[in-house]
Amino acid sequence: MEERHGAVTMKGNPLTLVGREVKVGEAAPDFTALDNGLAPVKLSTFRGKVCILSSVPSLDTPVCDLETKKFNEEAGKLGPNVQILTISMDLPFAQKRWCGAAGVTKLQTLSDHRDASFGTAYGVLIKELRLLARAVFIVDSKGVLRYTQLVKEVTHEPDYAAVWDALKKVS
């Protein structure tokens, strides 16, 4: 499995990402993660919709909390042909608890804790921490990767304006 040392940092300290860096224009790798009820969910389930994949280290951290709430706010404005998936290594039970406490109902959270299927397929699994790096991917309705944003410093938020601009070009 490919490793990319220094691809991201946490508080300035370099970290290693496991998995190949995905590229715009290639088929989005399928993956399986667990929903809040422990049911397996594949990316291919959403074929026919544009998917925003938001990868976060943990919903129980301030930046991930803020980011996921922002995406939830926008999700209600996007219509039925766009699906936002927030993926972390948090257990499904923790994701369900967090969504309930935060009032997040317009996007779907998925847990990659079991197999790191998403993390390795998209090259965002942090080797040293077994957490996901902060990143945003947009997959078009045909399953093609149309946008990638790896946030270099894990403690920073993504560039939301760039995500929404890219989404306009895809949907």
Enumerate the predicted regions with their spans.
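Chalcogenol-based redox active-site neighborhoods
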Residues: 1-171
